[in-house]
Amino acid sequence: MTENRQLGALLAACHWIGEKGWCPATGGNMSLRLDLAHCLITESGKDKGSLAAEDFLLVETANNHVPSGRTPSAETGLHTLLYRLYPEIQAVLHTHSVNATVLSRVERSNALVLQGYEMQKSLSGQRSHLDAVVIPIFDNDQDIPALAQRVAAYADNRPLQYGFLVRGHGLYCWGNSVVEARRHLEGLEFLFQCELQRRLFDVNSNVDVKPNVDVNPNVEAK
């Protein structure tokens, strides 16, 4: 019964993500842990805004084997890696939003640091806007096992929290339930949009923009 509720919650999250436009043209992939040895993940080539329960495939997390023989998402290995690394993770959401894709290319370092935003508290455990939230950025790679190795190497030195970006590709985020994963996704997307807008304003800060209306409060309307 719990599994059915979680899958129902994941389907609802996928439809919501589709409405947001965060997984266009069948992009992205979503998964749900069943137990320590198995997860469900979206089948390759499925539109995330119209997924049904039968579009999720059973996968063995130890080796990415799919008993049904159907084709799971090409990035299944990143989902199963996260489930192996962190037993508390129950759901993983991978999206291709404009904000995540562009910001991951604009940021030249290997991490995006978010600080000063009240909405950082949408992420579990965050208590203050003064703290720094570090979202690692990994260079994109069509060799998913190689990319997974780089993610695992990072995690050996510093625990992954909330999510990571793949440059020019998108966001992976997760939670200890579908509800938490969805909240983390929404919070991070808001923060990404804020950070992207802030950087755009910084670039244009030397431009003298004058209002095209009279804003003098002492002038009476005629």
UniProtKB/Swiss-Prot annotation:
It comes from the Bacteria. Gene3D superfamilies: Class II aldolase/adducin N-terminal domain. Keywords: Amino-acid biosynthesis, Lyase, Metal-binding, Methionine biosynthesis, Zinc. One of its GO terms (biological process) is monosaccharide metabolic process. Coiled coil: none annotated. Pathway: Amino-acid biosynthesis; L-methionine biosynthesis via salvage pathway; L-methionine from S-methyl-5-thio-alpha-D-ribose 1-phosphate: step 2/6. Pfam families: Aldolase_II. It catalyses: 5-(methylsulfanyl)-D-ribulose 1-phosphate = 5-methylsulfanyl-2,3-dioxopentyl phosphate + H2O. One of its GO terms (cellular component) is cytoplasm. Its cofactor is Zn(2+). Zn(2+) binds at H94, H96. Its EC number is 4.2.1.109. InterPro entries: Aldolase_II/adducin_N, Aldolase_II/adducin_N_sf, MethylthioRu-1-P_deHdtase_MtnB. Binds 1 zinc ion per subunit. GO terms for molecular function: methylthioribulose 1-phosphate dehydratase activity; zinc ion binding. Belongs to the aldolase class II family. MtnB subfamily. PANTHER family: METHYLTHIORIBULOSE-1-PHOSPHATE DEHYDRATASE. NCBIfam families: PRK09220.1, salvage_mtnB. Catalyzes the dehydration of methylthioribulose-1-phosphate (MTRu-1-P) into 2,3-diketo-5-methylthiopentyl-1-phosphate (DK-MTP-1-P). This is Methylthioribulose-1-phosphate dehydratase. The gene is mtnB.
